[in-house]
Amino acid sequence: ERLERAMAELVPGLSAHPYLSGVEKACFMSHAVLWKQALDEGVPYVAVFEDDVLFGKDAEKFLAEDTWLEERFDKDSAFIVRLETMFMHVLTSPSGVADYGGRAFPLLESEHCGTAGYIISRKAMRFFL
């Protein structure tokens, strides 16, 4: 019942989505509720991680401070920085964003359903909510 109320408030129509299971809807809503809280608190961006995410080599370079993020992305723009992969083949294109810590930031040009780790900006949160 709480889940249905939250879906009705934050993501109308999600409960009727035919291709998502109840568990998938609940998982998505855990993200949406966090985005709403971040928006309410005026946070410029938030890092989101699933409880079973495995951190890779040099993850601390991306998580210990945010200077690299602020140097590469305008906090007032809509962006999502994916910090994980499911080893799913995707199409990408160059973004023009400078590499950091041996990692590139290409634009995602195809679908990728993983949400185990990402950074989402305030404007992107507003877009999805």
Could you tell me what each predicted segment is?
Residues 1-49, 53-129:
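An acidic/histidine-cluster motif and surrounding catalytic segment
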